[in-house]
Amino acid sequence: MAGRKGGDRKKAVTRSVKAGLQFPVGRIGRYLKKGRYAQRVGSGAPVYLAAVLEYLAAEVLELAGNAAKDNKKTRIIPRHLLLAVRNDQELGRLLAGVTIAHGGVIPNINSVLLPKKSPAAAEKEAKSQKAAAKSPKKKTAATKE
């Protein structure tokens, strides 16, 4: 008998679980109300905002994980976050005005600043690349004699 005072209570199910999200829907709703962004906040607004934030976080973390793997590291550091965000066109536009602490800069050298190759050096390099492309002939027992 589930009366007023005694009995078994149902286990509370959070809105995050109902929506299938990891980000806290209740906390985001509280922040929306407390921040006075509007007089009233709809019930779907914090769910939608939590989903958007979770998607963005997952996207950035995936790209940062790839950047860490490219650098043969197992831990994501701010440098990997910066490389992930700045090398992605859409995220780079979204976070254009954001500074990531200890992120460094994107490696870039203007082509005007690079040393110019002399025609002789360029020709010599082209010949060496052609020679490297050819595979050397193996000496067999018949050719050694």
UniProtKB/Swiss-Prot annotation:
| Record motif SPKK motif, residues | 135-138
On whether Lipid metabolism is a keyword of this UniProt record, the answer is no
Q: List the disulfide bonds.
A: none
* Top-rank taxon: Eukaryota
Per UniProt, the ranges with Basic residues bias are 135-145
Enumerate the GO terms in the molecular function aspect. DNA binding; protein heterodimerization activity; structural constituent of chromatin
Localization, per the record, is:
Nucleus; Chromosome
Example of a GO cellular component annotation carried by this entry: nucleosome
**Where do the record's region annotations for Disordered lie?**
118-145
**Keywords for the protein's UniProt record, in alphabetical order:** Chromosome, DNA-binding, Nucleosome core, Nucleus
| Tissues in which the protein is found | Abundant in meristematic tissues.
> What Pfam families does the database record attribute to this sequence?
Histone, Histone_H2A_C
GO terms, biological process: heterochromatin formation
Which Gene3D superfamilies does the entry link to?
Histone, subunit A (1.10.20.10)
Q: Which family does it belong to?
A: Belongs to the histone H2A family.
Assembly description:
The nucleosome is a histone octamer containing two molecules each of H2A, H2B, H3 and H4 assembled in one H3-H4 heterotetramer and two H2A-H2B heterodimers. The octamer wraps approximately 147 bp of DNA.
Known role:
Core component of nucleosome. Nucleosomes wrap and compact DNA into chromatin, limiting DNA accessibility to the cellular machineries which require DNA as a template. Histones thereby play a central role in transcription regulation, DNA repair, DNA replication and chromosomal stability. DNA accessibility is regulated via a complex set of post-translational modifications of histones, also called histone code, and nucleosome remodeling.
Q: Which PANTHER family match?
A: HISTONE H2A
| Notes concerning its domains | Contains one SPKK motif which may interact with the minor groove of A/T-rich DNA sites. Phosphorylation of this motif may regulate DNA binding. This motif is reiterated in both termini of histone H1 and in the N-terminus of sea urchin histones H2B, but its presence in the C-terminus seems to be unique to plant H2A.
The protein, known as: Protein H2A.5
